[in-house]
């Protein structure tokens, strides 16, 4: 897939997710622990009729054998891993984790949402 196609992959859906996150941040405020933001996103997704799964489990395989589970915060539109954070800033560590999440789930797009500051920090990651 070329760069232009990657930029367009689930573009509108990602903007809908970010819109929900901005609404959550504006309503709850910034800097509380992660779980209330995740749960508020669930409420907002429901209000906006965005399909989602909360805390679905995916097997982590090693040489064909399951060696653990990965449980992402949310999967939206059956296609996008959504990871909520309350951290100083999104770094290569979080980007690397998201790439691993995408490999484990078999999905192509992830969104990292950071609720630490008054302005939402977010990044879209494409595998």
Can you describe what each PLM-predicted range is?
Residues 46-61:
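A short acidic/basic microdomain associated with nuclease active sites
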Residues 85-127:
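Nucleic-acid nuclease catalytic cores
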Residues 29, 52, 72-90, 101:
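Conserved catalytic cores of phosphodiester-cleaving nucleases, focusing on short active-site segments
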Residues 1-8:
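Short, low-complexity, charge-dense intrinsically disordered segments
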Residues 49, 66-70:
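A short, glycine/Asx- and small/polar-enriched loop/turn
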Residues 22-36:
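A short, highly charged nucleic-acid-interacting micro-segment common to nuclease
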